[in-house]
């Protein structure tokens, strides 16, 4: 059976060595847009994306993330954070009385991120 999605999943690879070629603004926007199009729990998108451009901060992150120098060398560094504040914003936007996120909501946010 030929299935394009399965073929793409099987052809996927991790890249940890990068060229010096910068990521264009359009490529950056397309990457973030693709992330926002991914399904999330209840379509709540309980995450925030940080675009880390400061070389010193990338170097610090590389150290803190189990000494992975590819983080500092990558031409694009997006950090996905579980963000339960978005849960509260959704309540406010719906005009509903918010409740504090519980343990399960934190797990949903972590899975979304």
Task: Walk through the language-model features, giving the residues of each.
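Acidic, surface-exposed loops and disordered segments
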Residues: 1-113
